[in-house]
Amino acid sequence: MKAQELRNKNVEELNAELNNLLGEQFKLRMQAATGQLQQTHQLKQVRRNIARVKTVLNQKAGE
């Protein structure tokens, strides 16, 4: 997910994307806690995608 792709979305779409990412992060954290997560890099990717979405939301709020 690129920041430019996120900037082209409206606030409602960004909030929906944020909710999806937070749900995915929760699932990955539960898998990691139970030892079922094989691809641990996914946690880092999701965390950074959440940060990207939040950054774009803050930029749009400032406009």
Swiss-Prot record:
It holds the Pfam family Ribosomal_L29. The keyword Lyase does not apply. Belongs to the universal ribosomal protein uL29 family. The gene is rpmC. GO terms for biological process: translation. This is Large ribosomal subunit protein uL29. One of its GO terms (molecular function) is structural constituent of ribosome. It comes from Actinobacillus succinogenes (strain ATCC 55618 / DSM 22257 / CCUG 43843 / 130Z). InterPro entries: Ribosomal_protein_uL29 (IPR050063), Ribosomal_uL29 (IPR001854), Ribosomal_uL29_CS (IPR018254), Ribosomal_uL29_sf (IPR036049). The keyword Ribonucleoprotein applies. SUPFAM superfamilies: Ribosomal protein L29 (L29p). GO terms for cellular component: cytosolic large ribosomal subunit. PANTHER family: 60S RIBOSOMAL PROTEIN L35/50S RIBOSOMAL PROTEIN L29, LARGE RIBOSOMAL SUBUNIT PROTEIN UL29C. It comes from the Bacteria. Keywords: Ribonucleoprotein, Ribosomal protein.
